[in-house]
């Protein structure tokens, strides 16, 4: 099942992160050939999707025993759309506290806690977002992008170029254009997804 965004075109709010998380997980399974049939509401089928290459380029894995550069991970997570928070409770969030890194990957049922020993990932465990207690040991964690569109410099450049092609007038007077140019994803931006690709 590919969930709908459950918003209307040109709403000034974005879909709930749980829905985006489910959508990205489903799109990932489809792109890997793990899903042969997808149930899609008629309204959902009308909207264009991000290309498979976007999902493939912004999906990465972390494995127990792997050497990890925390600063590089922060940059990679920010580029993939993850939000740095003090306590992880929702998909698309991460937190770094000393040798502990909490991640709530898109498409995951539970958040993950990475325990570092020096620069190595000593353990990966799922944890309860409410109690913050660890639950099950894992060998690796898959991190999908946190949104269905790229907000990196190349994505913003494509958006600005296509925005000027599609919409008349001075783009510098558009709040949407200015927000995207500044790297801010305004509410409802998902309906402008074709302008990013």
Regions found by a protein language model. Give the residues of each.
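ASCE RecA-like P-loop NTPase motor cores
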Residues: 1-197
